Amino acid sequence: MARNPRGGKQIVATNRKARHDYAIIELFEAGVALLGTEVKSLREGHASLADAFATVDSGEVWLRNMHIPEYQHGSWTNHDPRRNRKLLLHRRQIDTLVGKIRDGNLALVPLSLYFAEGKVKVELALARGKKLHDKRQDMARRDAQREVIRELGRRAKGML
């Protein structure tokens, strides 16, 4: 994976189903405590957030079930691909998360994993799970929006 010459975000992995399955309430950026072979594997662009989720245990936030495959050139120092990884947040942010999770039926869902200024960051969302009818409404809204754009394009081209 090539480095970003402008120093912006270099996205490694995204959780595409998260925005479909959850209604996002608030976004957080957190650092991730990783081992050397994990960082090398991420630099090659290998990671999956498909089944990942975050939990708060005894005042610490943990990212669970994220898959970072073993580094190809690593030896006995390689890591466990599905190990729990600690997320680095300020105490106030953790306290806010704990309060909001306790109050409502909310979950912490990772949306993307990226490099920012050489450090691995994860974009976390405080989210509420969508019901089936919510997903259908979103799909209908997207279809209607697509149809409006298509119609405007036809009119602009003079097809009607």
Curated annotation (Swiss-Prot):
HAMAP family: SmpB (MF_00023)
Pfam family name, one: SmpB
Protein name (database record): SsrA-binding protein
GO term, biological process aspect, one: trans-translation
Localization per record: Cytoplasm
Bilayer-spanning residue ranges: none
Signal peptide: none
Organism domain of life: Bacteria
GO cellular component assignments: cytosol
An MF annotation (GO) of this entry: RNA binding
Keywords: Cytoplasm, RNA-binding
Keyword DNA damage assigned: no
SUPFAM superfamilies hit by this protein: Small protein B (SmpB)
Principal subcellular localisation of the protein: cytoplasm
Function: Required for rescue of stalled ribosomes mediated by trans-translation. Binds to transfer-messenger RNA (tmRNA), required for stable association of tmRNA with ribosomes. tmRNA and SmpB together mimic tRNA shape, replacing the anticodon stem-loop with SmpB. tmRNA is encoded by the ssrA gene; the 2 termini fold to resemble tRNA(Ala) and it encodes a 'tag peptide', a short internal open reading frame. During trans-translation Ala-aminoacylated tmRNA acts like a tRNA, entering the A-site of stalled ribosomes, displacing the stalled mRNA.
Source species: Mycobacterium leprae (strain TN)
Family: Belongs to the SmpB family.
Keyword Coiled coil (UniProt): no
InterPro entries: SmpB (IPR023620), SsrA-bd_prot (IPR000037), SsrA-bd_prot_CS (IPR020081)
